[in-house]
Amino acid sequence: MWVKTQWHSLVNLDRCTGLSYWYDQFARKWVIRAYTGEGEDDYWSICETDTEEEAKNWMNRLAAVVEVVVV
């Protein structure tokens, strides 16, 4: 499944190995990431949200349509 990120890049979630979210203190936003490989920095940022709850909801919606591990 291809998704367009908030920054207009296309990411194939079928090739991702996992999803997670984290708080970016610089931007003061919660960021949902899709991991694409073995390395710590092999990921695409999918979108930003204002609250942790929104980030969890986005991540769970994405995980419901593709087979990825939620980290």
Model-based region annotation:
Residues 1-71:
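Eukaryotic intrinsically disordered, low-complexity regulatory linkers and tails enriched in Ser/Thr/Pro
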